[in-house]
Regions:
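Iron-sulfur cluster-binding electron-transfer modules in prokaryotic oxidoreductases
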Residues: 1-198
Length: 198
């Protein structure tokens, strides 16, 4: 905690539900006195950072089992950030931390169920015009483990039209442009961003 005192941290922003839960349970107030913890999606919403009407598209939203969004229903937060053209993709993705490695038999069955759900959602999105017949379906999430699991579906569905990504990465691409990541890395490397190794 003393290592970070000079920074006068007011808010810790996290992007992972498991990280959020761990920090909350690990004497957060002792480490960051007088500080609050908030999910990045809810933080962006507080700052009124969201996609404009022109930037909005149809998306599937995968709400992870360990959602970092704690202030309100995650679907409400996601719609506020990305627009109303969002369809929730129910069911666990099957990644579940280490489940895919420790119990691949169970994880595979969970993945098959999720794949069926994605196919249903894809059909509904195309039938209602949320996405075009040849457009990619983007499934967005807030969980690193889920992103890894959802990325596997692109190969499994064999139509090449499914992409998985983080909600904040999709927003960054639309708001900051396709070069946002190299620009961010360059700014960090040039000393424009405070880095702390604890």
């Amino acid at each position: 905690a003393n290592t970070l005192n000079y920074l006068d941290i007011k808010t810790v922003v996290v992007s992972c539900g498991t990280c959020y839960d761990q920090l909350q349970g690990y004497k957060f107030e002792d480490i960051f006195p007088g500080c609050r913890i908030v999910d990045i999606h809810e933080f962006l919403l507080e700052k009124d950072i969201k996609l404009s009407a022109e930037q909005q598209a149809g998306y599937l939203f995968h709400d992870p089992c360990h959602s970092p969004m704690k202030q309100q229903d995650p679907m409400k937060t996601v719609k506020a950030l990305l627009g109303d053209q969002i369809r929730k993709s129910d069911r666990c993705c099957g990644e579940s931390g280490t489940l895919g490695v420790t119990r691949p038999d169970i994880a595979t069955q969970v993945r098959f169920r999720k794949e069926e759900e994605i196919r249903k959602s894809e059909t509904q999105m195309r039938d209602t015009g949320m996405v075009g017949a040849k457009d990619n379906i983007k499934v967005l999430t807030s969980c690193p483990s889920c992103l890894q699991g959802l990325s596997r579906y692109g190969d499994d569905l064999q139509n090449g039209l499914l992409e998985a990504d983080y909600i904040v990465v999709e927003m960054a691409k639309h708001i900051l442009g396709d070069q946002w990541m190299p620009e961010y890395v360059a700014a960090a490397n040039a000393g424009g961003i405070e880095r702390v190794l604890v």
